[in-house]
């Protein structure tokens, strides 16, 4: 066997070290962002108002990273409101201090102050979102998170020609903080929004708009495009369509799916969906539409937000060249069921669906809204949100700090695992089941297998609820209409390739079962992502204990953690 000269061996070692450093740097980049929270005047629907923004943009800037990257975001508060930012769907493994919900994991960033969010993107790739997580500020303080695969790792589907971020939202002519504050004072529901938006604009068919207004997506015939679609609306489940074009779903909530074709998407607040669109139509402009889904007797904004898909070499700019789209009926439950039934995890060798097959902790949580007595309210009652008949009261000290430092009197660990009052949840149950108030949490040991059945209730009216769990992804193993039956319902569960996500819509008058593993120590918020329901108290939190190893332990709090 020939022996390499010393200089040749040193050269090879140096080359190997360089390649190793390149590989490590490719997977361990630190990305720096600065978010300045500032007021800006914005004109929509014939009127102008000041809104909170990040860096003066609405929606805010897109945060780009790759799987494995460390992300540093300095948030500077230049406005008169307290602010926090939540990185919706980012797992925050052991870094719960940076999760963002006010008074759950941190005190707000006060006017004139700043906070450096510091987290790593671990085992995730796809589309998520960031948004303010205090009061109703996320109405305008929100934006996209685009997590690209590691360098050299392809998508598990044909690579698109280009990608585009599509942020769906709502617009109020009034100040949104005034809207919810007045509603809370009176004890009633808030005013609905005045329009739906696509990338911040109601679109070319809205009040005071011209045919050229709104977001425009330019395409070339024969090319395939990936749309990263985010529902950043406060209170509405939304349908999304593109006139004359089929959509191929390839990912939801930053998890790859088995691809399937559809002409209509259903996206609840907080959810994301990536679709491929083939530009296979003739020259012209084609309408994109966003419209509400509500299959309960609840008032929602029925305005359709629009944008245009514009083919290259389209000569005419008049409305005559615009292909319109017909939104689904507002109560199109059959379209929603077909869409959600089509969602399955990819469950490939590279992207397995690690569904817990056994259950250590089983919870049945009823979710809904009810009424409590309120002598000062306009009707003598106050609308409240509940989980297991508990209306959550926000503390003045963050629960994570109280947990970490063993501060007494901030929360109690007696959140009920099953309903305290059992009744026909989706039938003719009690119409005035007074709730209990409390800052109650449910404690979980590290790495337990957890099943949560989310059961809608009809105390006022059955209604869908988009439930978001911080700190974890979960598998949606089952759903059904009516009341969950612990004896028969589990036989319908999908434990092979259920969809994995961080936000799930509990169907109107039905139930959804999710499973996850409590492998992330800290305090993790779970709440309805209809902001009005969260304001009313439809929320709770899990406290997850540390594991035995340092890698299973919550990191210490940062030195610049905001103080209350």
Curated annotation (Swiss-Prot):
Signal peptide: 1-25
Enzyme class, spelled out: oxidoreductase
Alphabetical list of InterPro entries matching this protein: Cu-oxidase-like_N, Cu-oxidase_2nd, Cu-oxidase_C, Cu-oxidase_fam, Cu_oxidase_CS, Cu_oxidase_Cu_BS, Cupredoxin, CuRO_1_LCC
GO molecular function, one term: hydroquinone:oxygen oxidoreductase activity
Residues annotated as domain Plastocyanin-like: 36-152, 162-314, 414-548
GO cellular component annotations of the record: apoplast
Binding residues for Cu cation 3: 133, 470, 527
Binding site for Cu cation 4: 465, 528, 533
Entry annotated with the keyword Signal: yes
Protein name per the record: Laccase-22
Species of origin: Oryza sativa subsp. japonica
Keywords: Apoplast, Copper, Glycoprotein, Lignin degradation, Metal-binding, Oxidoreductase, Repeat, Secreted, Signal
Lineage per the UniProt record: Eukaryota, Viridiplantae, Streptophyta, Embryophyta, Tracheophyta
EC number: 1.10.3.2
Binding sites annotated in the UniProt record for Cu cation 1: 86, 468
Family that this chain belongs to: Belongs to the multicopper oxidase family.
Origin superkingdom: Eukaryota
Annotated compartments: Secreted, Extracellular space, Apoplast
Cofactor note: Binds 4 Cu cations per monomer.
GO BP, sorted A to Z: lignin catabolic process
Glycosylation sites: 41, 82, 118, 191, 302, 331, 379, 389, 424, 437, 447
Entry cofactors: Cu cation
